Amino acid sequence: MTQESTHTTQNSYPLPQALTRLQDQPQVQNLLARALHEHKLAHAYLFVGAPGSGKGLAAKALAQCVLCAQGGDAACDDCIRISRGTHPDVHVLTPASANGYLIEQIRQLIADVSLAPMRSTHKIYVIDRADLLRENSANALLKTIEEPPADTIFILSARSSSAVLPTIVSRCQVVAFRTLTDAAAKAAIMREISATEQEARIALAATGTPGRAVEFLQSSTRKNIRRQLIDVFGNLLRNDSWDVLTSAKELIEAAKIPLGDVRRAQEEALAQNEDFLTSAALKQVEAANKRELTARERSGIIEMLAILESLLRDVLLCCEAVDEEIVNTDAAGIIDRVASQTHTQGVLGALAAVQEAQYNLDRSVSPQLTLEVMLLHIKEALTCPPLSR
């Protein structure tokens, strides 16, 4: 599973090419390189760290090292499939709802674990947000994590080990990721793609993590949605309530456009793997794909909220005359105009409306209703009679 490399870690372990991307987490990089070199991989890992610390990147890198015949060259067909999320032996699970994992998701996972790998010698199961494994789901998973087949590796991730049920933590090797500074996060984005520092800063504000920021910058559709949202924000004070409701509807429609790319990727992956799948497995994949589309739609709305929050924070800087560069420099004119028409308390009220929208989304309130109420509340807050600043 390992490959000799011209790269080495700080403790001189051979470093597979796939692990070179973990340079911002040298301790993690060294731990995984050593485990691969000594053929002592754990059967279950728990990656813990703040969002944006590179847990997802590390999970993909480890999967590449394990499944690639060259030990993680990051260039072969298997590695490319893993990078794109289409490898049939790498299964990524995310919570089916804002409240956590469904017991049915875990039962499907357990049933799949017993099946042989399709392309490689091993299978990897990545369980994101392991802190959202509720007691019934966690209990169903315990024995499988504790005694998985020899060809199976679990990689769980969470913000902290204390947020995960102790029974799960005790069955995993915990790997801690340090929090990246803003400068390191921007540098990671700029290493990954050709982006300016300002583009990286804007993308980070919209998405929260370097990995998602890269995806954002590579998506013309998502960048267009941001531009549309800036226009809505700029016209909010001059538009009437009907215009605001129309804007909310248009934003919801725009948020659905990127889902077409997700559907096409799902269909491509299904076409590549359907010869290996039983009819029952096909149904499981289709159900998982539907859950992914629902989750992606929700994440698109959350991204809109983050963009609005970033714009409002820039307005707040202007209202308070803080000597600090705004994030959304490409919307500086709009930000200055809104700041001249409102005051600090109004902006704080608008920010509270964004937080309330996040709360409502977490409780499965309709996305369109959530946006409508939020935009109306932001308009109301910002148009309060100006106070002395």
Can you describe what each PLM-predicted range is?
Residues 74-101, 163-164:
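AAA+/P-loop NTPase substrate/partner-engagement loops
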Residues 129-133, 160-161:
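Conserved Walker B
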Residues 44, 70-73:
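Residues immediately within or flanking Cys/His clusters that coordinate Zn2+
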Residues 308:
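Conserved phosphate-interacting/catalytic interface
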Residues 2-64, 77, 81, 150-152, ...:
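Charged, glycine-rich active-site and insertion segments that engage polyanionic ligands
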Residues 31-35, 103-124, 132, 136-143:
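Conserved alpha-helical scaffold flanking the Walker A/P-loop in AAA+ ATPase domains
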Residues 96-103, 130, 174-175:
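Flexible beta-alpha connector loops of hexameric P-loop NTPases
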Residues 119-124, 149-155:
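Loop/turn-to-beta-strand initiation segments
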